[in-house]
Amino acid sequence: MSQKPAKEGPRLSKNQKYSEHFSIHCCPPFTFLNSKKEIVDRKYSICKSGCFYQKKEEDWICCACQKTRTSRRAKSPQRPKQQPAAPPAVVRAPAKPRSPPRSERQPRSPPRSERQPRSPPRSERQPRSPPRSERQPRPRPEVRPPPAKQRPPQKSKQQPRSSPLRGPGASRGGSPVKASRFW
């Protein structure tokens, strides 16, 4: 465990250094924005925020200072740079179509809650057939599966009974009379 923090330690320190550079003053290798809102890499420059470096170009604004300024109150030349942040709002729009599937899930959950009360009043279904018929459209998919499970065994019972009546030709797909003709 002690080895992991030792490895992550220097990485964190580098990140801290970068964050300090961004928050406190400009760093040589980082990008700067000029008055034309163009992002350019400048090794030595001073931005409007008062960062210190060799070249005195007040037109250049480093991205770090821009980020700090934007949180406070961005200047007019910096505000257009924020507008590209509007696309995330557009990205949120597709998230809205995702909500309708959730609305579909909600109707499904109430039928589940209805299943429990149905089991005790099954004996009452006969006298209350009219109100039950109104509720049946929803539980139809739920009611159909159990009878379907009961039907297959009935069919299996019928098949062995019918097979001796049909004879050996039935397995071939034809009647025993047709089978005798082929022979």
Curated annotation (Swiss-Prot):
Organism of this sequence: Homo sapiens (Human)
Residue windows of the Sequence repeats: 97-106, 107-116, 117-126, 127-136
Name of the protein: Myelin-associated oligodendrocyte basic protein
Amino acid composition bias (Basic and acidic residues), ranges on this chain: 101-143
Cysteine pairs bridged by disulfides in the record: none
Keyword match Acetylation: no
GO-annotated molecular function: structural constituent of myelin sheath
Location(s), subcellular: Cytoplasm, Perinuclear region
GO BP, sorted A to Z: nervous system development
Pfam families, sorted: FYVE_2 (PF02318)
Keyword Cytoplasm annotated: yes
